[in-house]
Amino acid sequence: MVLEKRGVVKPEEGVRALLEHLGEDVTRPGVVDTPKRFVKALGELTRGLREPPPEVVFFPLEYDAEPGPVVIENISAVSLCEHHLLPILLSVSVAYIPGDGVPGLSKVIRLVKWAAARPIMQERFTEWLADLLMEKLRARAVAVEVCGVHMCSFIRGVRDEHHNMVTRAKRGDIDVKLRCRRPPLCR
C-alpha cells in the first residue's frame, strides 16, 4: 500500500493502535486478525483511488434517427463519507444521449461503481460523475441522480435511519426525469 512505500507505520499497526485506544483487547482471538481484515476492506472500498477507470466498449448505433436518452436506473454502489470514513450506500441513476456509438451497459455500471469507490462528499461526487460520464461515454448529454444513505448520520450523530440525500447534475441538453430509489439495504 501507499503508506508502506513512504516508510510510515504499517496500516495494520495503526488499526491495532486505534483498537487499543478504544479499549479493545487486541489479543482476543476474534480481534487478533481484525487490523488485517480492516485494511483489506478499506482497500476494497477505496479501490477507485488506485485502479484506473474501466475501459468502455462502444457499439455502433446502426440507425439514422437521432438517438434519444438511454436511462439506467438504480445502480447500487458503496462509497465512504470523506469526513467520517463511514459507508454511504448509494443508488445512482444515469441518463445519456449517445454520441459516437453506444457504450456497453455493464461498462456504464462498472464506471459508476469505480467512481464511487473512494471517500466522497455526495454533492461534489454527483457533479464529478456527470463530467466523468460525459467524457468516458462520449455522450452528447448526461443527467445523474444520486440517492445516498449516509451511515455518519444513520448510526451516529442524529441517528436518523429514515433520511436519504438526493443530488442531481446535468450536462448538455437532456430532458429526462430520473428517480432513484433508496438504496436496497435501506428500504
Swiss-Prot record:
Write out the catalysed reaction. GTP + H2O = 7,8-dihydroneopterin 3'-triphosphate + formate + H(+)
This protein's pathway: Cofactor biosynthesis; 7,8-dihydroneopterin triphosphate biosynthesis; 7,8-dihydroneopterin triphosphate from GTP: step 1/1
Entry's Gene Ontology molecular function annotations: GTP binding; GTP cyclohydrolase I activity; zinc ion binding
Q: Which Pfam families match?
A: GTP_cyclohydroI
Where is Zn(2+) bound in this sequence? Answer: C81, H84, C152
SUPFAM superfamilies in the record = Tetrahydrobiopterin biosynthesis enzymes-like
The alphabetized list of GO BP terms reads: one-carbon metabolic process; tetrahydrobiopterin biosynthetic process; tetrahydrofolate biosynthetic process
Does the keyword section mention Plastid?
no
Does the record bear Zinc in its keywords? Answer: yes
Keywords in alphabetical order, please.
GTP-binding, Hydrolase, Metal-binding, Nucleotide-binding, One-carbon metabolism, Zinc
Q: What is said about its interaction partners and assembly?
A: Homomer.
- This one is known as GTP cyclohydrolase 1
